[in-house]
Amino acid sequence: MSKLCQITGKKPMMGNKVSHANNKTKRIFNLNLSKKRFFIKKKWILLKVSSAGIKTINKFGIEKTLKKLNFNVKKKY
């Protein structure tokens, strides 16, 4: 899935767009995703992360976060 955070696992949500007249139409609430590079074990990896994922990495560190998720760094992303 292309619109998926690789850290938190969040994906787009479905909901209703409500007008002033209370008419409801379906819409998608997309994530605030960005491609971000991180330096781990003498090399750069590219992750697609949401803003919540970036906050998690800033709080705990990239290595501890990836270890908690059993993320394989050897694969190319």
Swiss-Prot record:
One of its GO terms (cellular component) is ribosome. Keywords: Ribonucleoprotein, Ribosomal protein. GO terms for molecular function: structural constituent of ribosome. InterPro entries: Bacterial_rp_bL28, Ribosomal_bL28, Ribosomal_bL28/bL31-like_sf, Ribosomal_bL28_bact-type, Ribosomal_bL28_sf. GO terms for biological process: translation. It holds the Pfam family Ribosomal_L28. The keyword Ribosomal protein applies. Disulfide bonds: none annotated. The keyword Ribonucleoprotein applies. Belongs to the bacterial ribosomal protein bL28 family. This is Large ribosomal subunit protein bL28. It comes from Karelsulcia muelleri (strain GWSS). The gene is rpmB.
